[in-house]
Amino acid sequence: MITNYSEGNSLSTIPVEKNDDILSMEEILEISGLDMMQGILDGIYPPAPISKLLNYNVHAVEKGKVVFRGEPNLASRNPMGTLHGGWYGTILDSAMACAVMTTLPKGKIQTTLEFKVNIIRPIPADVEVDAIGTVEHAGRSTGVAVGRIVDVASGKLYASASTTCIIMTPKLK
């Protein structure tokens, strides 16, 4: 729970998740990355807990492209009342890494090696945005993607980003 200490009022309550609310590594390795992301979109598989925390969801999926739609909440604001830079980074990392995931066959996973975010302008309160991740390269050992955050209503660009992901074949015990 996030609390306003000066007032003693609760700003929002973040539910505590159980491990049952995410796919196991065994389950992930049995499906392609595209099937996993499509399953999350369709409600067959659970979304990543971070998306609930930061108020965004998978909105569209195709091979090499994923769109997350969200609206930053009050808990995502910094002490000055503007949107914390970590929100931009998190939703863009999700969109770009998941776009790379859509290119992977079953038995493969990926994770972010590095990413860079360029915040162009602040996202105002009560604005719904799309974070669009698009793959530029999907190789055997790395994937490269770019991302952007745009206003759903106007198309205004708020941020752009790029990432490199490592592609792995995990060995289960």
Regions picked out by a protein language model, each given a short descriptive name:
Residues 1-173:
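Terminal targeting signals and extreme-terminal segments of soluble enzymes
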